[in-house]
Amino acid sequence: MASETVTNHQEKALALLQADAEKILRLIKVQMDHLTMPQCPLYEEVLDTQMFGLSREVDFAVRLDLISEEQGKEMLGELERELSALHEAFTNKK
């Protein structure tokens, strides 16, 4: 029973983190769709805050052994790749 509870908590933690990552990904996609300047202070502030918050959530979940360090790195890495693609798309638009 205890093993089931741990597994349930791990699955729930991963699902919550993925949902938060998806929200950030949607912000990035909206910017890519409109190729709004990524240097906009408001855009940068919101995205930086969201990314920082998610990184803290991931760190907390890793420290509690709810997700693996690799899962956390993969999740954050995917978002960072999307951010790079946004910056590249905007730069190419100029």
UniProtKB/Swiss-Prot annotation:
Which superkingdom heads the taxonomic lineage of this protein's source?
Answer: Bacteria
Q: Name one Pfam family in it.
A: DUF1507
Q: Which family would the database say this protein is a member of? A: Belongs to the UPF0358 family.
Give the protein's recorded name.
UPF0358 protein Bcer98_2651
Name its species: Bacillus cytotoxicus (strain DSM 22905 / CIP 110041 / 391-98 / NVH 391-98)
